[in-house]
Design a protein with these regions (language model features):
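Conserved short alpha-helical segments that host acidic/polar catalytic motifs at enzyme active sites
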Residues: 1-171
Length: 172
C-alpha cells in the first residue's frame, strides 16, 4: 500500500516530506519520491528502495521548493524502479497516487493514439497526461482534475502539484 503526503510551508518542503514519509514506512514500499514547486517550476527526485536512498539523492541534489508532495510506492503496475517511482509528472502537473486505476491500459492506449509518449509502466502516469491535456485546453487546475476523475475506474487517493501555482495552493 502506498503512502502520500502534501506539504505547504515557509521553508524547504523536501526535508518535511521525508520526515512524513518515514512515518508511513510501516506500510511497506519499494521506492519513494518527492516533487516541489520552485519558482513556478516542478522539480522532483525519486529513488528505488528505502527512503535513505531518496535522502542521499536529496543531499546531492536538494530541492528548495516550499510546497510539495511525496510518495512511498508499493508496485501494482510496473516493476520497482526509480523510473516507476512517484511522483509522475509532465511539464504542467505532478501527481502521487494510492490505489489502482482499473482501466489504465485502455486510457493509455487512447492517449498513445493521440501521440502521448509514456516513460513508465505505471497506471498513475495516465492521470498526469489526462490532467495535462485538460490544462492545455485552458482548464484551471481544479477543473482539469474534475474533468479527469470521471474517466478513471477504481479506488484511489490522489494529490497534485501544478506548475506555475503560487505558494499556498495545492490540491490534495
Amino acid at each position: 500500500m502506498c503512502g502520500i503526503i502534501g506539504i505547504i510551508g515557509g521553508e524547504a518542503a523536501a526535508p518535511h516530506l521525508i520526515d512524513a514519509l518515514k512515518r508511513l514506512e510501516y506500510r511497506g514500499y519499494d521506492s519513494a519520491g518527492v516533487a516541489t514547486l520552485e519558482n513556478g517550476k516542478l522539480t522532483r527526485r525519486r529513488a528505488e528502495g528505502k527512503l535513505k536512498n531518496l535522502e542521499n539523492r536529496l543531499a546531492r541534489e536538494p530541492l528548495a521548493g516550499r510546497i510539495g508532495i511525496g510518495h512511498t510506492r508499493w508496485a501494482t503496475h510496473g516493476r520497482p524502479s526509480e523510473n516507476n517511482a512517484h511522483p509522475h509528472a509532465t511539464e504542467k502537473v505532478a501527481v502521487v497516487h494510492n490505489g489502482i486505476i482499473e482501466n489504465f491500459a485502455e486510457l493509455r492506449r487512447e492517449l498513445e493514439h493521440r501521440g502521448v509518449k509514456f516513460s513508465t509502466e505505471t497506471d498513475t502516469e495516465v492521470i498526469a497526461h489526462l490532467v495535462t491535456e485538460e490544462l492545455k485546453r485552458g482548464a484551471p487546475p481544479v477543473d482539469a482534475v474534475k474533468s479527469t476523475l470521471p474517466l478513471l475506474r477504481g479506488a484511489f487517493a490522489l494529490a497534485f502539484l501544478f506548475a506555475g501555482e503560487e505558494i499556498g495552493r495545492a490540491h490534495v
